[in-house]
Amino acid sequence: NDGIADSLVPSMLTIDVTAANDAPTAIDTTVSASEDIPYVFTPEDFGFSDVDATDVLEGITVTTLSEIGTLSLNDTTVTAGQTISHDDIFNGGLIFTPLANDNGVGYDSFTFTVNDGDVDSANQATLTIDVAAANDAPTAIDTTVSASEDTPYVFTPSDFGFSDIDENDVLEGITVTRLSSVGTLALNETTVTAGQTISHDDIFNGGLTFTPLADDNGVFYDSFNFTVNDGIADSLVPSMLTIDVT
């Protein structure tokens, strides 16, 4: 309109809208690790969403650290506020190490933001780490028993020193790694051989006996070595059972 008349033919005004990058969103995730084994993160472990369909995860920033285990990048402890690239994660550089012999659901966690190559997420998310329990080998402990001259000694399970960091594990058997050298060690009246495994039940039922020589006695009279078993693993180091004969 020129102030008096409108144009006879309408025209079109086209509006171009230039795209702007939208910040991504970090999403809470949980990973499953195993006791005594460092967990190696992958990019997929970090929850990422972006309304810009072509944007992908380019990196993260660790905003708060794990409290129990250790988060490290290429063998160096990660610090709060540290930015870690997608490639560093993809190449296996980001690792979480739980405490030795420790485990649990919701064992540890840290928070992070994600980056799409241009901008960080406005929110931070939590990555929770579950650590599955693994069996730990038990420990055999040196012990001494007191037998009587000319009387076979009948062993009980409590004669064999046993310790296990897994508090629910108990003695399930022993292996005789070195034989007695003076008297005779027998299982159900058959002489025991080096390397023989003997179950808890055989010991509990009175099957394992030691017979000293006739009319013989002494402090530290004889001994043999053994390992203990928790039903899964043997102790790594044998211990000694000493027999005093009075």
Predicted regions and their residues:
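Acidic, turn/loop-rich segments in luminal/extracellular domains of secretory-pathway
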Residues: N1-N21, A33-V40, D45-V56, S66-A134, ...
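Proline-enriched interdomain boundary motifs that mark the N-terminal boundary
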Residues: D22-T29, D136-T143
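Catalytic-core segments of thiol-dependent peptidases
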Residues: G59
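Conserved, well-structured core segments
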Residues: G173
